[in-house]
Amino acid sequence: METATILGILIAAAVVGITVLALDTAFGPPAAELSDPFEDHED
């Protein structure tokens, strides 16, 4: 394969991996540890 093809696949895989990690952090089990600033704020 050409170098550009391999580089494109590598970059696409990195972007997909970062997206999956972000979605897992936002909606998966680690989300229970995140605080909600709107609930923490007292009016």
From Swiss-Prot:
Keywords noted in UniProt: Membrane, Thylakoid, Transmembrane, Transmembrane helix
Entry-linked Pfam families: PsbN (PF02468)
InterPro entries membership: PSII_PsbN (IPR003398)
Keyword Hydrolase: no
Membrane-topology annotation of the record: Single-pass membrane protein
Localization, UniProt: Cellular thylakoid membrane
Keyword flag Transmembrane helix: yes
Chief place where the protein resides: membrane
SS bond list: none
Example of a GO cellular component annotation carried by this entry: plasma membrane-derived thylakoid membrane
Segments passing through the bilayer: 3-23
Record-level GO BP terms: photosynthesis
Domain of life of the organism encoding this protein: Bacteria
Family the entry assigns: Belongs to the PsbN family.
Stated role: May play a role in photosystem I and II biogenesis.
UniProt-recorded name of the protein: Protein PsbN 1
